[in-house]
Amino acid sequence: MITVSNLGMQFGGQWLFQHVDLQFLPGNCYGIIGANGAGKSTFLRILTGELDSTNGSVTVDPTKRVSVLKQNQNAYDTYTVMDTVIMGNQHLYDVMKEKDAIYEKPDFSDDDGLRAADLEAEFAELGGWEAESDASRLLQGLGIGTELHYDQMANVDPRLKVKVLLAQALFGNPDIVMLDEPTNNLDIEAISWLEDFLLDFPGMVIAVSHDRHFLNTVCTHTVDIDYGKIKMYVGNYDFWYESSQMVQAMLRNKNKKNQEKIEELQLFIQRFSANKSKAKQATARRKLLDKLTVEEMPCSTRRYPFVGFQPERELGKDVLTVKDVSVTVDGVKLLDKVYFSVNRTDKIAFVGENELAQTALFKILMGELEPDEGSVKWGVSTIRSYLPKDNSEYFDGNEMELVDWLRQYSAKKDDVYLRGFLGRMLFSNEDVFKPVNVLSGGEKVRCMLSKMMLSGANVVLLDQPTNHLDMESIQAVNKGLEAFPGVVLLASHDHEMLTSTCNRVIAFQPDGTIIDKYGTYDDYLAWMAERKAAQNA
């Protein structure tokens, strides 16, 4: 159990949160949510003991083993992948290494033999003989093949290092697991595996996340950081959202009724306070008026942008034909004779473990990369707009003010018009004069969305649009794509967005080919599960 008592955290004279009293119980999964800057990661770091709070205390059952998802990908570069995972249980790893060191000594003494015997017993009790096979299962579940298990971490692709550190956090049956954005940089298959793992996990899980599907799937409780407070709700993200909306609606309704009653009483008092026959009634109403209040609506840290794409013209019958496209990058064949056509009602989810293939295809479609073979033909009625995964070329070294940066992509040049689009993306007042090269990752994505909204496109291509965005911005993008009457080509890890937006799935296979299925993303997953079951039968 973890007990949080009168906890408060202050930065620069401002309280992030205070007067926090919570209990986290075994067997539950807690999802921590809140706007960017609300203090989610700070609160988690206080729970892990990495950060001291300004006041209050956190008490963790000392008999329980706590495992934390590490954030420094390069901290284990001198170790093998296997050792890095086993270090998730540091005591087991220390016993294993001490035991191995004794056996490697050239002058093995009687004392060494006695110590080795003790270590062997402890090693067995800690599950040491199953450690490598357990670690291997975790790695394979996350999509890391056995050929990499004994490689040095320094030689491992950064995208896979994230998975290794996640396997480390899950290794060895810890009692409590604390995860900060565990689905970041994971492909959808790995996220699905993680969800299944946590559903079966008997211990306590505390996770910061902005992945709605993940939170809805695994969480039994939701911990919301807002209004300078931290509140715990029983239920998943959707239950929290409905509950919080209901509470706000009730408060607004109560305030409205109280305000109407206040105005009615004030009018009566004003009219009859000087009337002797009504004096007692006026006095009674004045007492009632003193009891009525209109509660101030607290100011939320959540800010909701607006995403809306308005096409300049309707699409014609011919939208896009991709014919036998192949491309090899750095000696790896990413696309092999890929063929598909796009209809004007299509909203396509591009999925698969190989994100490089998705990005390569999008670059080919936008004319930024030449295929080795094949052709791409766009319909004459199409107007395309593109959100790349890597937007650095638009911002790095660019000292233009934000409003001037956007102006270069707009037919209308006046400030009021441009600031209207920036305002939809939460850039207001002095924000519009920021140099674009100092913007955060999330701000840069919101700039790109402003650019897309200006384009009048009837075909939008988005490569991992939710990277760097908070929950509120992700929901805004989701709603914008759902409402968009044109064609959507979407590569994303966001299960909720794919399911609610798309009516077709194109899945990239390891050999560079594709699977093309009409239906929702959930329909595709069900079809894949049936296919796998049939293959294993």
Language model: regions and residue ranges:
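Short, flexible cytosolic linker that couples an ABC transmembrane/permease module to its adjacent nucleotide-binding
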Residues: 298-314
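A structural signal for long alpha-helical coiled-coils and helix-turn connectors
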Residues: 103, 241, 270-273, 290-293, ...
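ABC ATP-binding cassette signature C-motif
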Residues: 1-255, 309-537
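Short amphipathic coiled-coil heptad-repeat segments
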Residues: 136-142, 267-271, 287-292
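ABC ATPase nucleotide-binding domains
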Residues: 251-265, 271, 276-287, 303, ...
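Short low-complexity stretches enriched in small and charged residues
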Residues: 25-26, 276-280, 301, 344
